[in-house]
Amino acid sequence: LHWAELVSGQFFQDHQKRFQRSKSADQMLLNNLKSVRQQLKKLQLDYNTIHDLLARIIFIQFLFDRKDSQGHPALNQEFLDHLHEIGELSARYSGLPELLGNHRDTYRFFRWLNDRFNGDLFPGKGATEAEREVEWRTEEQKVTQRHLNLLAEFVSGELEMETGQRCLWQQYSFDAIPLDFISSIYEEFVRENTTDKGVHYTPGHIVDFILDGVLPWDSEVWNIQILDPACGSGIFLVKAFQRLIHRWKKANRGAEITSNILKSLLERNLFGIDINPQAVRVASFSLYLTMCDEIDPRRYWQEVRFPRLRDRQLICADFFQEDREGFRTQLDSDQYDLVVGNAPWGKNSMTPLAKSWAKANQWETSYGDIGLLFLPKAADVTKPGGQIAMMQPALALIFNQVGTAKKFREKLFSKFKIEEIVNLSALRFGLFKDAISPTCIITMSVMSPDGEPLIYICPKPVLTNQDDYHIVIEPQDINSIYPQEAIKDPLVWTALMWGGRRDLALVRRLSKLKSLGDMEKNQIVVSTQGIIRGNRKERDETLIGKRILKQFPDETFLFLKTEQLDINNDPYAERPRKSKSKAFESPQLMIKQSWQTKTKRFRAAIARLDQQTQKGIICTESYVSVHVDETDLSVLEAACVSYNSKLAVYYLLLSSGRFASYIPEVKPKDLLRVPIPKYRVGLLNNIETIEDVDLYIRESFSFKDSEWILIEDIFNYTLPDFKGDNSSPGRQTTRRSSKNNSESVLTEYCEYFVRVLKAGFGQDKNVCATIFQEHNTAHLPIRLVAIHLKGSGTEGVQIEPIDSPTLLEQLKRLDKLFLDKANQDDGGIFYQRVARIYDSVQLNGQTIPTIYLIKPDKIRYWTRSMALRDADEVAADIMMWRSELDKTSEVMEESSRG
C-alpha cells in the first residue's frame, strides 16, 4: 500500500466492497433494534414506552461494558450480587438477560439506577412524590413480563430477527457508542412515526464540518451559550458539548473535569428545541452518554447525577412560539453566542406559529417552506457579533428565482454578514440515503455586511465510500462572492458551482444575447409546455385528432417526422391554458426539457408536417412547443441548432439551479433563456452532423479559443462526472489517454498554462514546463508538473523521469508533509488532494523560479480549462507579490531619504 493511494483516494476506490457502510456493526445492530421494536409493538406496547425501554437497556449495557482506568466495568455480576446482599434485589443474577426475567426486580433495579443517576432515562419526574409514584406504577403496569422476556432474549442474543438470524447484541461493544448510531436510531424510530418529511438526520461528519468553522477545537473559550433550534437526536449539541469540554480542559490545564462541571455545562451552555417529543428523549439520552464518557466509571455511583434536561434545556416546542422562555424574539434577544443545527424544510412545511411569526416580522418565504425562517429568528436571539451556522434548503436559499425568494435573499444578505455558504447539492446522494432535495450550509454573523466577500464552497463527490465519512474540498471548489453579486446576480450560484470566474463572465455575456424568451416578450414567438392531464376535469376538443409527441423517434435529428407519431384521442388536459394554444400550430420547434443521458445533450427538432398535421402537433408535458409565423421560420432553425449544441448544455448547467443541483430537467422558463445564434433562411440545409451543429455555434457566436475550451470541458468532463460514475471520462487516469508516454493530457494542460502566463506578462517571456514521469517504477496515483518562469535555454513542454535522487527526496518530504497535515484542521492533500508549491531550481547554471503542481492522476484535474484557472491564480499571486515588493521598496526609499 503506497501512501499516495490513501491520500488520493485510489485505495478506497479500488476496494469499495470492503468498506460498505450498510455492513458495519452499528448498522446491523440498528436493524436488530428495529426488529425488536416491531416485535414489542405487536405485543401491544406503545412506542413511547418502547423507546424508553430500549434507551434504558442500551445505557445499562453501556455500564456493563464501560471499563475504568484499571479495566473494571462500572456494572458486573459482583455489583448485582451486592445489590442482592443489601436487599435491593430479591435474588442473585449473572447479568442483564437473567435480571430481565424478573419483572419486580427489573423495576427495583430501574428505581435504584434512577436514584443514582436522576435525569430523564426513567419515569417519575413529576413535581410531587405522589405524581412521581403514579408515573412509575403506570409504566410498571404497561410493561408486562412478556415484554421483558422479549428484551431478555434480545440482549442474550437468542432472539430471532426477521431475517432468520440471531441478533448482534452480544457481539457489540457498548463502551463507546458512536454518535451516528444514536442519530440513526432517531432517524429510524422517530421519523417513521411522523408525517413530518421536512426533518432530515444529519451525518456526523457534516456536523463536525459545520462546527469546525464556528466552534473549533483550538480555543480556550468554553463559557458560551449554544442553541440548536431543531435539535433532533441532539447530534449538534453532543458534538458541541464535546468541544466545550475540550476547551474547558485546555483553559484549565492540569485540572480534572468533574461531574459537577459537566453538569453545569449541560445546564448553562447548551439549549435545544424540537417540535417532536421523541427527539427530545433521544437528545437527552445522547447528552447523558457523552457526560458518562468523560468520567471514570469508578466514580459513576458516587458522583454522577444527571441534570434534568427535558422541559428545561431541551424543550419540546415550536421554535416560533413566543410564549416559551429561552427563544422569544423580543424578551430573549441577544441571548446566545452561537446557533447551530439542521432546520426542517420542504414545501408546505410552515407551521401556523411560523406563519404568524413571519408575518409579524415581515419575512417572506416561498412555497410555504419553513426552513429559511430559522435564520432570521435565530439572529433575533443571538448576541451582536454572534454566529449562526445551519443547514438549509439550497433551492430555496440560493437557487430559487421567484419573487418571494429574491426578496428573502436580498433582505437576509443586506441585514447580516454572510460569511460562508457551502453548497452540498452535488453530494446529496452520498449524504442522505433518501436523496432529499439539495442542501447547503450557511454561516452568518449577526452584524451588518462590511463589503467583504463571502466564501462559496461547492464540494464534489469522490465517488467512493469515502463520501460516507468526510467531505473533500479542493481548490477549484472554492470561490469568493461579493454581497451585491449575491443579492443581484442569480448566476453566481450556478456558474460558480461547476465553473470558475471565467465561466461566470462567459455566462453573463451569453445571458445578454437574444433568446426565445426575449422574443416571446416581443410577441415574435409563442411557447407552451406540453399538455398536463391533471385531474381530467377540463376538456379541450381541439386536442382530438392531432398527432402527439410523447418521445422523439431515435433517428430524429433537427427535423421531426410527424407521420411516426400517434394520433391523440384524449380531450382532457388541465394545461396549457387555451390562450397558449397557438403554440401548437405550425411552424413548430419541439424541445425536450431534460438532458439526455445517451447523447449527453438536450434535444430539439422542427416538426415536418404530413397531411394529418398541417395545423401542428401537440406534445406531453416533458416537451416545450415553440411557434412562430411562417416568415420567422429562420428563428426556429437557429434555435434548433443552439438547443442541440454543446452550448445549450453548458449554459443550462451554469444558469439553471434545477439542472445544476437537482435533476437533469430544466423548467420551460430557464430553457427559453438559451442564447440563439444569428438566423438566416436555409440555415439547416448545410448542417448534416452533430459536429456541424457545434461548429456553426462556435463560428456564429465568435467564441475565442479560451471560451470554447470552457464549454467543451464542461460538456466532456464536468457534467458526465456529476451525472455518471467512476467510469466517466474525467475520472480516468491521464495516462490512459496517452500513447508511447506522449502525455497528451498533461501536455495540453501545460501549453494552456504557459499561454495564459505569456498573455499576462508578455509573449517574450520564456516560460516552459516539465512533466515528470515514473521510470522503471509503478505509476503513482498523483502527477507532478513544474512550470518554470524564466529562460533556461529550453521552451515548450519537456518530459523528464521522476527517479532522480533529488526529486525522490523532495517527494519524500512531501510525503511526510501530506501525512502530517492529514489530521490537522486545514486538511492537506488527504482532504484537498491538490498542492501548488512555489520554489526555485537550478537549470543550466541559472536559478529558475518554479511552480510545482501536484494533483491526483485523474483527467478532471488536468483539463485545459483547469489550466486556465490554475494559471489565472498563479498570475494573481505573482501580481500580488510584485505589488507588495513595490510597496516595500517605496518604504525603504522613503526611509533612506529621511
Protein language model regions, located:
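Structural motif
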Residues: K41-L54, S173-D180, T365-S366, E585, ...
